[in-house]
Amino acid sequence: MPIQVLPPQLANQIAAGEVVERPASVVKELVENSLDAGATRIDIDIERGGAKLIRIRDNGCGIKKDELALALARHATSKIASLDDLEAIISLGFRGEALASISSVSRLTLTSRTAEQQEAWQAYAEGRDMDVTVKPAAHPVGTTLEVLDLFYNTPARRKFLRTEKTEFNHIDEIIRRIALARFDVTISLSHNGKIVRQYRAVPEGGQKERRLGAICGTAFLEQALAIEWQHGDLTLRGWVADPNHTTPALAEIQYCYVNGRMMRDRLINHAIRQACEDKLGADQQPAFVLYLEIDPHQVDVNVHPAKHEVRFHQSRLVHDFIYQGVLSVLQQQLETPLPLDDEPQPAPRAIPENRVAAGRNHFAEPAVREPVAPRYSPAPASGSRPAASWPNAQPGYQKQQGEVYRQLLQTPAPMQKPKAPEPQEPALAANSQSFGRVLTIVHSDCALLERDGNISLLSLPVAERWLRQAQLTPGEVPVCAQPLLIPLRLKVSGEEKSALEKAQSALAELGIDFQSDAQHVTIRAVPLPLRQQNLQILIPELIGYLAKQSVFEPGNIAQWIARNLMSEHAQWSMAQAITLLADVERLCPQLVKTPPGGLLQSVDLHPAIKALKDE
């Protein structure tokens, strides 16, 4: 047989063998196109598991009439134009093959309108040469793609489709993954005329946990530990489930994204597994929803036909970065909580209200229960939040679901040794260790609190500063030092070097480890609260402060560091506020008894109440 150029339809069908595996593959490609077009709402209609109909409608920017024919051509795209673009891809699609491949194995119709056009246009390809026909149509700004009779002209491919239910489950899973990647987009999914999923867009902040719970379930939400980890151009955020409470059902939740693109990457999975291996059994798997952001120049996404895998230019650095981030939040969660004081605890005691609220609703009343091993969460670093705080981000959280959280809080820790009965005291004494219930957030950084009928305002940045100081101040043992993935090397003067050497023992108690030579100092480890700070700014400022001191007390240094740390929250959510106050109540009980003026201010409602009654 002589060498010959294949007809366009046959060439597209060959390409479709890589891109279009099943109906879910079509949905993935088309929804990603909608996201690249800037859509904020995407409606997906499926019939018979996608074999009969796949319809994707969005409100994106649309496609111009003159470009509709090109949109259905192979290797035609608006997302890259040069090799430099290919090496720094930020869009989800870039090859320009999807529409041509899909149209070659189905009856595809593309209808679109841009904001500049007065009318919409419809395009479809047919025949051996895939000639494109364009005609007027009625359509709002945006694009609709209809894929009818998938694999109608390739019986062998159609024969390998599974049952309608199985194929739709694959589509449902794809939409779940996409919904987790884009919290700012409303996505609805219908099957055979019935709405099956509806994920509404949520703003930044605590509302994200609402969608997380809707997609991954309350079981994952209960055990979710938040991660915020950064180094240079690398950022890791998301949630990982507490390995001590991972179940086979939870282990199915393994979602990872690189620059917003869903991935199944062995390197990432290995790093997460390695971080959790000491807490997981041999037959257990970690559960996680993680987002890795990296300089697009440092990752190659053009290595897999369906773009499910990537190749990192510095794979070892990425692996260790993810490993350190996950390990850090797990170690923090498993730390032994510090006692509130040396006095014995009363037998029946009130749970701090913010912890009860975390399990039921925002306005839960104080609850009294028998003493059990408390599931205290360590102070959060880098924005991480204990599992019990997540439901507070969900307005109108259902009471029945809250029962699960209350049972979780009342479950004794298995390793805790039973204590002998102690004298009972009124529960009101323990309740004095609580600031009260968080009602709402005011002016983005103040919490409105209610306690015993009294209203007060609490400054969240000030509370965060006190918490950081408590975390940094060494107790009977020094603060745990966290090795830096990449040590920080700084040039110092002779005076600064002398001050550092004098303060070395005090800094070691704070978890700051360094090594100095003739003109440089290398910071090798810092305490956990400093890991997410910009150390290239903070450490030189700390060295300058030490150079002006004659006495080096760990407490004074911890106070200075706490005052100079950058807040991780430009705008606070309810969940973050409740978590913060719960940790302040645990580590800084003296602030509850005698709060400083800059932390807490009472709000007098009596004049307003009197004015209302006088009316």
From Swiss-Prot:
Disulfide cross-links: none
Record GO terms (molecular function): ATP binding; ATP hydrolysis activity; ATP-dependent DNA damage sensor activity; mismatched DNA binding
GO biological process, one term: mismatch repair
Pfam families: DNA_mis_repair, HATPase_c_3, MutL_C
Metal-binding is among the record's keywords: no
Annotated stretches, region: Disordered: 362-397
A Gene Ontology cellular-component term: mismatch repair complex
Xref: InterPro entries: DNA_mismatch_repair_CS, DNA_mismatch_repair_MutL, DNA_mismatch_S5_2-like, HATPase_C_sf, MutL/Mlh/PMS, MutL/Mlh/Pms-like, MutL_C, MutL_C_dimsub
Keywords: DNA damage, DNA repair
Biased composition (Low complexity): 373-391
Keyword Methyltransferase: no
HAMAP family assigned to the protein according to its UniProt record, in alphabetical order: DNA_mis_repair
Protein's job: This protein is involved in the repair of mismatches in DNA. It is required for dam-dependent methyl-directed DNA mismatch repair. May act as a 'molecular matchmaker', a protein that promotes the formation of a stable complex between two or more DNA-binding proteins in an ATP-dependent manner without itself being part of a final effector complex.
PANTHER family: DNA MISMATCH REPAIR PROTEIN MLH, PMS, MUTL (PTHR10073), DNA MISMATCH REPAIR PROTEIN MLH1 (PTHR10073:SF12)
Family membership noted in the UniProt record: Belongs to the DNA mismatch repair MutL/HexB family.
NCBIfam families referenced in this protein's UniProt entry, alphabetically: mutl, PRK00095.1-1
UniProt protein name: DNA mismatch repair protein MutL
Record organism: Escherichia coli O1:K1 / APEC
Name of encoding gene: mutL
